[in-house]
């Protein structure tokens, strides 16, 4: 049985911001579970028995060579992809990189990474990234 297809899956996401206010995005690769070729806030699946923050830390370490601090829950959203027959529940967290420089360690899952100014993001974003971005921009506007 497959997570997100045969039953609802849980996938965590990380919004990471550098000291210039740029957002870290990754382009989904050919082996991604869905929305291949689109840019996203990186993340991954939660394994059975794994806490959300631990899953996010593991995914950032495995896929990008990063150690992160999970700071705050931004959003929990339904990530429903009718064309792909998938449904994920997606908690997304605002995080900070504590060590490492981002690199692509699993090229099948990710083909490109980059830091983007919030006003100059790629237009081809995943569904959940668009939703998370809207909530993040509202959060920083309120906090400013």
Can you describe what each PLM-predicted range is?
Residues 18, 78-102, 136:
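Active-site-adjacent beta-strand/loop module that shapes the phosphate/pyrophosphate-binding cleft
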Residues 1-23, 76, 94:
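Conserved N-terminal beta-strand and adjoining loop/helix that marks the start
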């Amino acid at each position: 049985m497959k997570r997100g297809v045969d039953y609802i899956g849980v996938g965590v996401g990380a919004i990471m911001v550098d000291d210039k206010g740029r957002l870290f995005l990754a382009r989904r690769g050919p082996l991604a579970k869905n929305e291949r070729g689109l840019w996203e806030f990186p993340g991954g699946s939660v394994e059975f028995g794994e806490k959300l923050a631990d899953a996010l830390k593991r995914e950032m370490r495995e896929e990008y060579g990063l150690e992160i601090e999970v700071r705050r829950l931004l959003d929990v959203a339904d990530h429903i992809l009718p064309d792909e027959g998938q449904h994920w529940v997606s908690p997304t967290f605002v995080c900070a990189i504590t060590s490492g420089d981002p690199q692509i360690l699993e090229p099948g899952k990710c083909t490109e990474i980059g830091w983007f100014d919030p006003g100059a993001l790629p237009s081809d974003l995943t569904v959940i990234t668009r939703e998370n971005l809207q909530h993040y921009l509202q959060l920083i506007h309120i906090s400013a």
